[in-house]
From Swiss-Prot:
The keyword DNA-binding applies. Transcriptional repressor that contribute to growth arrest during terminal macrophage differentiation by repressing target genes involved in Ras-dependent proliferation. Represses MMP1 promoter activity. Residues 430-439 have a biased composition (Polar residues). It comes from the Eukaryota. One of its GO terms (biological process) is cellular response to granulocyte macrophage colony-stimulating factor stimulus. Residues 35-116 bind DNA. This is ETS translocation variant 3. The modification Phosphoserine is found at S139, S159, S315. The gene is Etv3. The keyword Transcription regulation applies. Residues 441-450 have a biased composition (Acidic residues). Residues 357-366, 380-392, 399-419, 451-466, 477-489 have a biased composition (Basic and acidic residues). SMART domains: ETS.
C-alpha cells in the first residue's frame, strides 16, 4: 500500500473485518471523498505518532484538543487531495457537525471539541473488530482502547451435540470473524490472531456460563447453525495499556457476579437499526436463566450513564427492551404517580364587580366615611336632630309663595310620617336611607345636607348589611316599604345614598330653585 495520504493501514491476514476498498484510498486516488472529517479525526486520535498534533483530553469523556490546527488542516487536505485546505475551512466543516449532534465545541477552551458518543451509531458494519493496531472503522463510534475486542466469532467446532451455545467463552470464541461470520462455515483459531496476553486477560475477565441444553436434538437439527456471541463488554480498567485513552477509568468497579467485567460507557445503549444482537436467536438476553446482570452493578451503571448524559444536555439513552433482563429504575428520575414534594397553592381569582363593591362597602362601614361635607364622629345619637327636623321644615314652608304652599305642606307631612314610622320600628335589616325634600331655596338645601351628614353615619350597620350588594339593599327596601314605592311613582322620591345619588339630590334642588 502506498504511504501517501492514507493514514489507516489495511490489516493483513484473516483477522478482523475487511473494510471496503474505498476506506483505504491512496494518494493517487482523486478526492477520496468517501471519508468524513470526524472519521479522519478519530483515525488521528488513535495514532500514537499524532499525539503532538491532536490528542484526547485527559479526564474528559470523549473530549479532544487540536494542538496544532495548521498541521491537522494540512493532513486533512492531503487526505482529501486539497492542498489549499486550512483551519478556517476545517472549522466550518466541524461546525456542520454541531447540528448533526456528532460533536460540539467545548466552551471556554480553544481548539477543544467533544464527541457525542451516544449519537455515533454503526448503521453499516455491525460486525466490527478493533485491532490493537488502532484501526478505526469508517462508520463506527470510537471504543475505549485498541486492546478491547468487539466481534462475533464463529461456532465452536468441538461442540459434541451441535447445539447452539452462545454463552460459552473458549479459545475459539476469541478468534476474529470475517465478513462471512454469519454463515455456517467454521475456521480454526490461528495463534497469530490473538495478541500476546490478551487471551489470558479475557479468560481471567470472563466466567463460564451454563450452556442452554433446553432445546431438543431433533429441533436443533433443523435449525441453522449460528455463531457464538462474544458480548460487547470491555475488560478491567487495569488491562488498558494506553495511557492516552480517555476511557482508562470505568465508572463501575468490578464486582462478583455472572460477568465479572465492568461495562464501559463507550458501549452505546441507543437501539439502532442494526443492533449489536442481529437476531433473537443470536441475542444473549433471551433467557434470564442463561444471562443475568448484577442488579447493583446495573443500577450504578445506569445512574452514571444518565448523569453523564444529563450533564452534556443530551437526551438520555434508552436501554434495549429484553424480556429476561430486569433493569432497576433510576434514582434520579421521578415517577409521575409520586406526589410532588412542593404543594401547589392556587390563588383565588381576582374580585369581580360584586366582590369589589362588597369590599368597598365593608371598608366604608369600618371607616364611617361620609359625603363631601364636614367630617363627623362615626357614633352620634341622631334622635335630637330628627326631632328638630320637622320644625325646621315647617318654618321653611311658611316663607314660601302661595302657589307652592299646598304642595310643600303635603310633602312635609309625608316625610314626617315616613320618619315617624322609621323610628317606631326596630332597626331594619337594611341600612336606613334618609329621604330629603328638594327645597326651592338654597339655604334649606344646605340645612338638609347638614342634617343628612349627621344622620347617615349615625345608624349602625350590621355586618351582613355591609356585605350586601347595593342592588339587593334597594330591592329589599323597595319590597318592604310600599310608601316609598308610592312616592317614587309621583316622581318626587329620590334615594339619598352615598355617592352619585346624593349629588343628584342636590342638583335637583338647585334646578327646582
Amino acid at each position: 500500500m502506498k504511504a501517501g495520504c492514507s493514514i489507516v493501514e489495511k490489516p493483513e491476514g484473516g483477522g478482523g473485518y475487511q473494510f471496503p476498498d474505498w476506506a483505504y484510498k491512496a494518494e493517487s486516488s482523486p478526492g477520496s471523498r468517501q471519508i468524513q472529517l470526524w472519521h479522519f479525526i478519530l483515525e488521528l486520535l488513535q495514532k500514537e505518532e499524532f499525539r503532538h498534533v491532536i490528542a484526547w483530553q485527559q479526564g474528559e469523556y470523549g473530549e479532544f484538543v487540536i494542538k496544532d490546527p495548521d498541521e491537522v488542516a494540512r493532513l486533512w487536505g492531503r487526505r482529501k487531495c486539497k492542498p489549499q485546505m486550512n483551519y478556517d475551512k476545517l472549522s466550518r466543516a466541524l461546525r456542520y457537525y454541531y447540528n448533526k449532534r456528532i460533536l460540539h465545541k467545548t466552551k471556554g477552551k480553544r481548539f477543544t471539541y467533544k464527541f457525542n458518543f451516544n449519537k455515533l451509531v454503526m448503521p453499516n458494519y455491525p460486525f466490527i473488530n478493533i485491532r490493537s493496531s488502532g484501526v478505526v472503522p469508517q462508520s463506527a463510534p470510537p471504543v475505549p482502547t485498541a486492546s478491547s475486542r468487539f466481534h462475533f466469532p464463529p461456532l465452536d467446532s468441538h461442540s459434541p451435540t451441535g447445539d447452539v451455545q452462545p454463552g460459552r467463552f473458549s479459545a475459539s470464541s476469541l478468534s476474529a470473524s470475517g465478513p462471512e461470520s454469519g454463515v455456517t462455515t467454521d475456521r480454526k483459531v490461528e495463534p497469530s490472531d490473538l495478541e500476546d496476553g490478551s487471551a489470558s486477560d479475557w479468560h481471567r475477565g470472563m466466567d463460564f456460563m451454563p450452556s442452554r441444553n433446553a432445546l431438543g436434538g431433533g429441533a436443533v437439527g433443523h435449525q441453522k447453525r449460528k455463531p457464538d456471541i462474544l458480548l460487547p463488554l470491555f475488560t478491567r480498567p487495569a488491562m488498558y495499556p494506553d495511557p492516552h485513552s480517555p476511557f482508562a477509568i470505568s465508572p463501575v468497579p468490578g464486582r462478583g457476579g455472572v460477568l465479572n467485567v465492568p461495562i464501559s460507557p463507550a458501549l452505546s445503549l441507543t437501539p439502532t437499526m442494526f443492533s449489536y444482537s442481529p437476531s433473537p436467536g443470536l441475542s444473549p438476553f433471551t433467557s434470564s436463566s442463561c444471562f443475568s446482570f448484577n442488579p447493583e452493578e446495573m443500577k450504578h451503571y445506569l445512574h452514571s450513564q444518565a448523569c453523564s448524559v444529563f450533564n452534556y444536555h443530551l437526551s438520555p439513552r434508552t436501554f434495549p427492551r429484553y424480556p429476561g433482563l430486569m433493569v432497576p429504575p433510576l434514582q434520579c428520575q421521578m415517577h409521575p404517580e409520586e406526589p410532588s414534594q412542593f404543594s401547589i397553592k392556587l390563588q383565588p381569582p381576582p374580585a369581580g364587580r360584586k366582590n369589589r363593591e362588597r369590599v368597598e362597602s365593608r371598608e366604608e362601614a369600618v371607616r364611617g366615611s361620609v359625603p363631601a361635607s364636614a367630617p363627623v364622629p362615626s357614633r352620634i345619637k341622631v334622635e335630637p336632630a330628627t326631632e328638630k327636623d320637622p320644625d325646621s321644615l315647617r318654618q321653611s314652608t311658611q316663607g314660601k309663595e302661595e302657589q307652592t304652599q299646598e304642595v310643600d305642606s303635603m310633602r312635609s307631612r309625608t316625610i314626617e310620617e315616613g320618619k315617624g314610622t322609621g323610628f317606631a320600628h326596630p332597626s331594619p335589616t337594611w341600612p336606613s336611607v334618609s329621604i330629603s325634600t328638594p327645597s326651592d331655596e338654597p339655604l334649606e338645601g344646605t340645612e338638609d345636607s347638614e342634617d343628612r351628614s349627621v344622620r347617615e353615619p349615625g345608624v349602625p350597620e350590621k355586618k351582613e348589611d355591609a356585605l350586601m350588594p347595593p342592588k339587593l339593599r334597594l330591592k329589599r327596601r323597595w319590597n318592604d316599604d310600599p310608601e316609598a314605592r308610592e312616592l317614587n311613582k309621583t316622581g318626587k322620591f329620590l334615594w339619598n345614598g352615598a355617592g352619585p345619588q346624593g349629588l343628584a339630590t342636590t342638583a335637583t334642588a338647585a334646578a327646582d330653585a
